[in-house]
Amino acid sequence: MKFISTFLALFMATVAANAQKYIGGDISALTRNETFNPTFLDKNGNTVSDPLDIFKSEEMNIMRVRLFVKPSDYANNDPWACQDLEYVKELGKRIKDKGFKLMLDFHYSDTWADPAKQWTPKQWETLTDDQLYTKIYEYTKDALEQMKAAGAEPEFIQTGNEISYGMLWGKEGSSSLKKCFLGSSANWSRFTTLLKNAGKACREVCPSAKIIIHTERAAQTNVLTNFYDRMKSDNVDYDIIGLSYYPVWHNTSATRETAIKTLESRKKKKNIMIVETGY
């Protein structure tokens, strides 16, 4: 899900009672916005050269940046889906240099990944499942190594974006997309193997980073808990339950609180973060 007209998409709050509190936003579009020579104003109307200084003054402490595999390969290229590795390394270092924590959001696609679309990157479309298991490990490892070398090591890593129905479904328009549904066993082993291989790379390169498994089913508590039960039964290694919460789709805040409290009671070893929201 995305709102490209919004410069700062507020997102993060850890909600477990004893957890470190984080608040921040997704500023993936910042570098592109700056190509239009905008003027940034603080809440008092004063011009500020770097908007990160505004966020810091408001006591934000974490920023998220999305990463696409090769956005230039996507046929219907969206100019706002421009966050390739070089872009993200530069922005990530800038975030870290300002003293923020960095959340890196792997989309594992050339374009936006969300519950309606999880298209396999063009360069990966002909790979078998076994080859994809190797590719996601190698790609994740290489990207993280490059981020570290650039001074942009993330403290939080999303291995997928809103992956409620799986990831790397196949080529857009294919009649045999490899989606996952909770009422069926089809493709779940494939999906969780992909997650485990991505997580393995995260542990090797960034052992202190927290791995986030991100879904958007905050309005459906039973579906949400069943999803994370599946992560447990398939031994997926991760640290944080990441949720999207958009009132327009996910009903009231009471619905969100019900989902969170249920997860807290059933997943006592996992922290919970709202990693994406908008109003």
Region spans (language model):
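Boundary/entry segment of secreted carbohydrate-active catalytic domains
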Residues: Q20-I54
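Substrate-binding cleft and catalytic face of glycoside hydrolase catalytic domains
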Residues: I54-E216
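Glycoside hydrolase catalytic-domain groove-lining segments
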Residues: S49-L52, S189, K200, E204-I211, ...
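Bacterial Sec-dependent N-terminal signal peptides
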Residues: M1-Q20
